[in-house]
Amino acid sequence: MKQQFICERRPKADPRNIVLGKNYRITFLTDRLVRFEYNESGAFVDEASQVIWYRDLEEVPFEIKQKNNFLEIQTKSIRIRYDERAFDESILSVKLRKPDNGCDLEWYYGKKEDRNLFGTARTLDEADGRIRLEKGILSRDGFAVLDDSKTILLTEDGWIKERKHGGEDFYLFAYGHDYRGAVKDFFRVTGRVPMLPKYALGNWWSR
């Protein structure tokens, strides 16, 4: 693809923000936005996906230690407990420390998002009346998951390719009820939504 058609992307995360094991990788994009990957083959994705283009954000300070056979990783906002095996509700949990309501909130892998505030619909094709919206990045539960495991990848030369190795690849938004902060950081990793220039809309007239 010609260079002028290739959009800017920075998909490789800062190595200082990564916790790497044999079959897992945990990447901190912010102190409240975390990427979790698990793959039995030990293969992980550094290319941009359809959704996530920018993983190279600022350094996120964190502390890591072993406690009772669990890995504990702590930023200024969250604490992760993980025992380094395939993700399961008893294997991986995250606690958000004293968000806006003053009480800790806890998420575990596979937890139902009953109070997710939903996002958008991919298309309105053949829509007739109410349509089902997809899960979004905001939730009254304080946590939301963006599953990126099956999206197409973007190559450096501007083309697309399928994921070869399977595995899990998801992003946990642990923002409590700070919805504005969650949306702001979402745009930091996805890029701004391109808007049509006014001249492309032609003349508008109403009376």
Residue ranges of model-derived segments:
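Short, Gly/Pro- and small/polar-rich lid/capping loops
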Residues: K2-A13
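Short Pro/Gly-enriched beta-strand edge/turn motifs at strand-loop
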Residues: I6-E8, W53-L57, N116-T120
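Short, ordered beta-strand-loop transition motifs
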Residues: P11-A13, G21, F28-D31, E63-E72, ...
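Glycine-centered tight beta-turn/hairpin loop motif at sheet-sheet or coil-to-beta transitions
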Residues: V19-N23, T75-I78
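Catalytic and substrate-binding clefts that recognize carbohydrates or anionic sugar/phosphate headgroups
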Residues: K65-R207
